[in-house]
Amino acid sequence: VKRRFLRSWLPEQNGCGIIYCATQKQTEEVCNDLNAWGYPAGRYHAGLTMEERQRNQNAFIKNELQVMVATNAFGMGIDKPDVRFVLHYTLPLDVEGYYQEAGRAGRDGLPAKCVLLFERRDIMQQRQLLEYSCEQRECSAEDKKLWLTNAYQRLRDIESYCFTRGCLRKYCLLYTSPSPRDT
C-alpha cells in the first residue's frame, strides 16, 4: 500500500524532498524503488561510510538529487531551505522526532508538505527497534526497564497523534512546548 501510494504521490510533488524510513533496509529498498522509477534519489543511514553519507548529503544540498531517503540519522545540522516535502514512510519513534523531521520542509517560507504514512504494523516494528536499542544500552536492568517504559509511552504518543481529529500543528506545539503562544 505504501509503495503504491509513493509511486502515485511523488510525480505530483515539485522540488526536492526527504523520505524518512525506520530502518537501513527500508531506506535501501525505497531508494532503489525511486531510482528504478526515474527519480534521482540518494540514501543516508548509519550503515554507510562517512564518505558516502557526505557525498550523498552534498549532492542533495546542490540539487543533484531530488529525493533523500534516510533514517533519522539525517537531519540534524542539515540546512536546506527549499525542501518542498517530507514524507515519513513509517511511524517515527516519537512526536519530538517527527516534529524535528517535519520541520525540514519549507524553511524558505514557501509552501511545503509533510505526509506521514502509518499502518498498525509500524507500531510493532518500532517496538522491536526500541527493544533492540534497549538491549544494546550499557546500564542496569532497572535503568533499561525505565528507558523502555518511557520509550513505549513516546511511541503511544505518536500513535495518538496519528488518530488526532483536531489540529495536528496544535497537537505538536502542545506536546513539544510547555506553553505554546500561538497555536
Where are these regions (language model features)?
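A conserved SF2-helicase RecA2
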Residues: 122-164
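Functionally engaged cysteine thiol sites
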Residues: 166-168
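Helicase motor core with emphasis on the C-terminal RecA-like subdomain
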Residues: 1-136
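Single conserved hydrophobic/aromatic residue that forms the stacking wall/gate
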Residues: 175-183
